[in-house]
């Protein structure tokens, strides 16, 4: 297999506390309406690697020969990247995974009684008996195995502990705890992962969905409880409400848990734009780290403080992702903000001019439902300096 570098090591043998196994190309593409072209999958994979992602869940052979061809192309393009395929309990899919050069195969096992009965129609002893030759096959073909515990969040702890014992006996190196329906909270996630950790000493991967808006929080809780690997998708793409977002998870691991996951944050904005374009999605202006307005400030109190010290109302330095903070005028601006921003643009306003400007800015924001741009602020300043009719008067004259 192509990737021989230890999965616990980053560039230059730098120890890595958490391994990102990004599944944008597999689970992310399962978002309704998302279908990446072959060229887009190649671009996304390369951009993920450029950003420091060390493992890719690259796809599933169950989609057919075209998917297998794309997986083989990915393998050739990125020979040093650890790649995993997602498979059902199906020998043909395991053979296909080896044929296209996958390093790992995630063999999905329905862990809850509900899914096991609905999908496999067999009791646990029969399921385990079927799993054993599949794991042996993967090993003979030169792949490492992750047991993907599908719907683990609805499985009993006793069942997961039994599966951990089976995994150890079969030489499986990693277990995936999948909150498939996104029903856990950080507290229950910590409890469940901690309990599993008492029975499993290999790699442990958290796969969190965002149905309750807690995928990132649940991922961090799992890491606190002992997870060594985390699944992410760019922009949180995925089934239903999506998965844990790469950009949020990696920033939170860095800032909240002080853990290194090898990510170059300056690469994330371009990566997110690339994936958004390929997925036909827009990036919300308030999306953490990469949204257009996440480093923009309007509130008068905040702007006044930021003009004195940028640290006052910024917990994340925008230079982390190659950006700068932006101060704008709007309905919530105050006199100091107006005076300070206008001064930055080269206009020193009197107290009367500042008050008139403040009224004009508020009217502008209410009328146009946006902040005035820099050119518009300059025009307003020039009008104040020239004692021209204010914007409010223009609106009244136009019947506004």
Swiss-Prot record:
UniProt GO MF annotations: homocitrate synthase activity
Keyword Transferase in record: yes
A matching Pfam family: HMGL-like
Gene3D superfamilies found in the cross-reference section: 1.10.238.260, Aldolase class I
Catalytic reaction annotation: acetyl-CoA + 2-oxoglutarate + H2O = (2R)-homocitrate + CoA + H(+)
Domain called Pyruvate carboxyltransferase: residue spans: 18-269
Source organism superkingdom: Bacteria
EC numbers on record: 2.3.3.14
One GO process term, biological-process aspect: nitrogen fixation
Keywords on record: Nitrogen fixation, Plasmid, Transferase
Cross-referenced PROSITE patterns: AIPM_HOMOCIT_SYNTH_1, AIPM_HOMOCIT_SYNTH_2, PYR_CT
Function: This protein is a Fe-Mo-cofactor biosynthetic component.
Family designation: Belongs to the alpha-IPM synthase/homocitrate synthase family.
Entry protein name: Homocitrate synthase
Originating species: Enterobacter agglomerans
């Amino acid at each position: 297999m192509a990737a021989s570098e230890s999965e616990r090591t980053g560039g230059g043998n730098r120890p890595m506390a958490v391994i990102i196994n990004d599944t944008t190309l597999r689970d992310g593409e399962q978002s309704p309406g998302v279908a990446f072209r072959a060229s887009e999958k190649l671009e996304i994979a390369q951009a993920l690697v450029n950003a420091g992602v060390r493992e890719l869940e690259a796809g599933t052979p169950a989609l057919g020969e075209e998917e297998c061809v794309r997986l083989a192309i990915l393998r050739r393009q990125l020979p040093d990247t650890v790649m995993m395929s997602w498979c059902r309990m199906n020998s043909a899919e395991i053979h296909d995974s080896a044929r296209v050069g996958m390093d790992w195969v995630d063999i999905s096992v329905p862990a809850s009684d509900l899914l096991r009965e609905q999908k496999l129609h067999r009791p646990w002893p029969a399921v385990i008996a079927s799993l054993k030759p599949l794991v042996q096959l993967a090993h003979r073909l030169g792949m490492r195995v992750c047991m993907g515990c599908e719907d683990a969040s609805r499985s009993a702890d006793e069942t997961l502990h039994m599966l951990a014992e089976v995994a150890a006996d079969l030489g499986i190196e990693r277990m995936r705890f999948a909150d498939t329906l996104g029903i856990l909270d950080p507290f229950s996630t910590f409890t469940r992962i901690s309990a599993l950790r008492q029975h499993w000493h290999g790699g442990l991967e958290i796969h969190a969905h965002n149905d309750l808006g807690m995928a990132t929080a649940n991922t961090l809780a799992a890491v606190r409880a002992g997870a060594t690997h985390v699944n992410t998708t760019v922009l949180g793409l995925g089934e239903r409400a999506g998965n844990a977002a790469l950009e949020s998870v990696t920033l939170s691991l860095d800032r909240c848990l002080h853990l290194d996951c090898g990510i170059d944050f300056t690469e994330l904005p371009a990566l997110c734009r690339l994936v958004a374009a390929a997925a036909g999605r827009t990036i919300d202006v308030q999306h953490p780290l990469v949204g257009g307005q996440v480093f923009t400030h309007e509130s008068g109190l905040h702007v006044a403080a930021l003009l004195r010290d940028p640290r006052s109302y910024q917990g994340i330095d925008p230079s982390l992702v190659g950006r700068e903070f932006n101060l704008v005028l709007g309905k919530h601006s105050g006199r100091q903000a107006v005076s300070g921003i206008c001064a930055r643009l080269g206009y020193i306003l009197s107290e009367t001019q500042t008050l008139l400007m403040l009224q004009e800015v508020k009217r502008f924001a209410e009328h146009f439902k946006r902040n005035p741009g820099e050119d518009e602020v300059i025009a307003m300043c020039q009008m104040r300096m020239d004692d021209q009719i204010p914007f409010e008067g223009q609106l009244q004259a136009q019947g506004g």
